[in-house]
């Protein structure tokens, strides 16, 4: 591990998410879906927030608009996302998933649920609640 217990906590949290993502994206790679981690995050967000704008997505993902514009263009080129002009603000585009984009999102959600169950298997309800409380406390420290 590392030189300090605090670093150990952050390291193990990082490694948990790294393994989770690696397992999740094995499915995408092996299933020939041809999307990147960042593209999958966009699909996930737009699926949960149909009609989201690029600005909303930018704030959520903490990425600049230029980077997201490239991601969105790639997803449009792959026919996974549709962008339509916002009738209330012609400078803004509203994003929605295509059927193909929704299909990939559904597969990712199913795989995410399976991996989540795997990750917390063996925890008692009390341990689960304690872990959730502690991780939430760490999360709040970064706000």
Q: How would you label these PLM feature ranges?
A:
Residues 17-18, 44-48, 109, 136:
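Short, locally clustered residues in the helix-turn-helix/winged-helix DNA-binding domain
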Residues 1-31:
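N-terminal leader segment of winged-helix/HTH proteins
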Residues 140-143:
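Generic C-terminal helix-cap and adjacent flexible tail
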Residues 21-26, 73-136:
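Charged, amphipathic alpha-helical coiled-coil/dimerization segments
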Residues 22-67, 72:
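N-terminal helix-turn-helix DNA-binding core of bacterial DNA-binding proteins
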Residues 7, 11, 41, 114-118:
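Positions in alpha-helical segments
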Residues 14, 44, 59, 106, ...:
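A cross-family signal for key residues in well-ordered alpha-helices
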């Amino acid at each position: 591990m590392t030189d300090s217990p605090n670093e150990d906590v952050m390291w193990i949290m990082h490694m948990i998410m790294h393994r989770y993502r690696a397992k999740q994206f094995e499915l995408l790679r092996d299933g020939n879906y041809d999307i990147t981690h960042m593209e999958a995050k966009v699909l996930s967000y737009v699926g949960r927030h149909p009609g989201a704008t690029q600005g909303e997505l930018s704030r959520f993902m903490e990425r600049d608009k230029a980077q997201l514009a490239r991601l969105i263009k790639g997803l449009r080129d792959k026919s996974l996302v549709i962008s339509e002009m916002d009738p209330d603000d012609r400078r803004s585009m509203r994003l929605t998933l295509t059927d193909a984009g929704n299909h990939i999102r559904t597969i990712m959600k199913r795989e995410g649920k399976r991996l989540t169950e795997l990750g917390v298997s063996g925890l008692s309800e009390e341990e689960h609640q304690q872990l959730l409380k502690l991780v939430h406390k760490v999360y709040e420290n970064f706000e």
